[in-house]
């Protein structure tokens, strides 16, 4: 029989670190939050190898007093709260007192800091949670934190880190989340010694367009207040700009599935930066150590605030209903003809069919995605590259320094996905595109592949393109269009699931219906 025994301090540290630090982007998040909480107006961030080799954050904030430096890396030590009541009136980003403890437990960690009232600074060095040195050093006012070789002492966790590019994309998203909202701070971001972003203080709209230059002149402002709180921000009017939107609650980037559902239902897939302001007691950030998830005292009131705010936009967004079938038709006949009765369309989402004694509710987007996926897979070359077509006129699109770096990092995947292109200064010049993509769709699909950290294989890319080319929930289908989709669906190799594994249909047995209403 195995006996129960207490864990070692070393193992406790590593387990605790896993709750806060899963990848380099988590480290970056915590360090940026600390720098902002320190009252900085300038923050420089240096990343190497996607954060796997180094993350360094330098700020000009108030610094840490030497007497507090040894305490700042202990668990549950913080200057930001002192009582339970403080949890319900939090104005700072950090408050749990776990971040530096966790980070220093799984890295080679150093912190140099100097308050304004002292002439010299102090440097603390910790390696894998073990104290190494605490020395006096020359330093400017502020704090510099260096995190090297993350997970060097936990090889299993290190093994699960993704590629340098994937980890950097996660770091980049984290950086953007905080750079967008903190417009009074001058941010600079470097990767592998190269400056990618230089964001001087500005207003919110300018900050967004500094980060995403292609949105200049293409942002719609929102500002709405009710008895619950306020929602404000900007929404892209550019249909081609397909990046994940950002939601802030009291200036903290958060994830809330229900809010995102509401937003998507009203503005479709457009990019947005939305801020929700609520009384502090209305929000519980203390749900998870990462503080990304959030709960509300009154979910319904917050949902209504978001819903009514978006409905109040001067230019309401309407879902488009154009969905030309742009890929080549499958070669050969349809095989054995399937006899079915098309009953109609429900909520512009489900095609309803009577077939072989049963009723089928078929998800129109999912079924079309399955058809497109199989047709596109037939257009692969033998070497695994997607076939290309030459454009009559090159597509030229201005790009930022950041996008330029990402394109260079992901050049191989983009080329395998059917794109041939050059970079001319800060212009992307596309010469060839996948055979099944129209010129109007080319830029959208190019940037979807670029910004999706999972888009490494051609199979995955084809799944994403099939999704993009397919009819959407909310599109109105003519009977002819619905019948064409159904005929093509019946001949697919895997009719039950879409490429992402979602079921295509739900079957209702007529016999079960008869039994339920007493006719069985």
UniProtKB/Swiss-Prot annotation:
The keyword Oxidoreductase does not apply. SUPFAM superfamilies: ATPase domain of HSP90 chaperone/DNA topoisomerase II/histidine kinase, DNA mismatch repair protein MutL, Ribosomal protein S5 domain 2-like. Keywords: DNA damage, DNA repair. One of its GO terms (cellular component) is mismatch repair complex. CDD domains: HATPase_MutL-MLH-PMS-like, MutL_Trans. GO terms for molecular function: ATP binding; ATP hydrolysis activity; ATP-dependent DNA damage sensor activity; mismatched DNA binding. It holds the Pfam family DNA_mis_repair. GO terms for biological process: mismatch repair. PANTHER family: DNA MISMATCH REPAIR PROTEIN MLH, PMS, MUTL (PTHR10073), DNA MISMATCH REPAIR PROTEIN MLH1 (PTHR10073:SF12). This protein is involved in the repair of mismatches in DNA. It is required for dam-dependent methyl-directed DNA mismatch repair. May act as a 'molecular matchmaker', a protein that promotes the formation of a stable complex between two or more DNA-binding proteins in an ATP-dependent manner without itself being part of a final effector complex. Belongs to the DNA mismatch repair MutL/HexB family. HAMAP family: DNA_mis_repair. This is DNA mismatch repair protein MutL.
């Amino acid at each position: 029989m195995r006996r129960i025994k207490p864990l070692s301090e070393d193992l406790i540290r590593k387990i605790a670190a896993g709750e806060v630090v899963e990848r380099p982007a988590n480290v970056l998040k915590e360090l940026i939050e600390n720098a902002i909480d320190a009252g900085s107006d300038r923050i420089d961030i240096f990343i190497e190898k996607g954060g796997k080799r180094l993350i360094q954050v330098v700020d000009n904030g108030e610094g840490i007093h030497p007497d507090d430096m040894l305490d700042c890396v202990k668990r549950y030590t913080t200057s930001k709260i002192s009582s339970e009541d403080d949890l319900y009136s939090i104005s700072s980003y950090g408050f749990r007192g776990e971040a530096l403890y966790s980070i220093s437990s799984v890295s080679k960690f150093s912190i140099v800091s100097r308050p304004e009232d002292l002439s010299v600074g102090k440097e603390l060095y910790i390696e894998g949670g073990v104290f190494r040195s605490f020395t006096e050093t020359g330093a400017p006012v502020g704090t510099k934190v260096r995190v090297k070789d993350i997970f060097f002492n936990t090889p299993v966790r290190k093994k699960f880190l993704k590629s340098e590019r994937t980890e950097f994309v996660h770091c980049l998203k984290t950086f953007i989340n905080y750079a967008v909202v903190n417009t009074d701070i001058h941010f600079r971001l470097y990767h592998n010694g190269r400056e990618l972003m230089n964001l001087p203080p500005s207003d919110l709209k300018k900050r967004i367009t500094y980060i995403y230059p292609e949105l200049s002149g293409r942002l719609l402002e929102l500002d709405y207040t009710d008895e619950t709180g306020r929602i404000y921000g900007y929404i892209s009017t550019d249909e081609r700009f397909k990046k994940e939107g950002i939601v802030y609650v009291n200036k903290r980037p958060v994830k809330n599935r229900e809010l995102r559902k509401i937003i998507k239902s009203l503005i479709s897939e457009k990019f947005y930066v939305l801020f929700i302001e609520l009384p502090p007691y209305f929000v519980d950030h203390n749900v998870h150590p990462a503080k990304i998830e959030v709960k509300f005292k009154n979910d319904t009131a917050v949902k209504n605030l978001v819903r009514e705010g978006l409905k109040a936009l001067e230019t309401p967004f309407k879902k488009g209903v154009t969905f030309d079938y742009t890929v080549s038709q499958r070669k050969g006949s349809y095989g054995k003809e399937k006899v079915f009765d098309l009953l109609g369309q429900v909520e512009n989402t489900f095609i309803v069919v009577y077939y072989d004694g049963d009723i089928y509710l078929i998800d129109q987007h999912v079924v079309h995605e399955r058809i497109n996926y199989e047709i596109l897979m037939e257009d692969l070359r033998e070497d695994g590259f997607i076939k290309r077509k030459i454009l009559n006129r090159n597509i030229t699109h201005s790009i930022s320094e950041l996008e330029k770096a990402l394109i260079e990092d992901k050049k191989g995947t983009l080329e395998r996905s059917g794109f041939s292109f050059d970079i001319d200064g800060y212009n992307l010049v596309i010469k060839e595109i996948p055979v099944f993509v129209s010129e109007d769709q080319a830029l959208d699909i190019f940037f979807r592949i670029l910004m999706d950290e999972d888009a490494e294989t051609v199979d995955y890319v084809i799944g994403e393109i099939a999704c993009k080319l397919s009819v959407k929930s909310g599109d109105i289908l003519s009977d002819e269009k619905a019948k064409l989709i159904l005929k093509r669906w019946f001949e697919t190799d895997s009719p039950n699931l879409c490429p992402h594994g979602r079921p295509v249909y739900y079957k209702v047995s007529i016999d079960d219906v008869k039994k339920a209403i007493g006719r069985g």
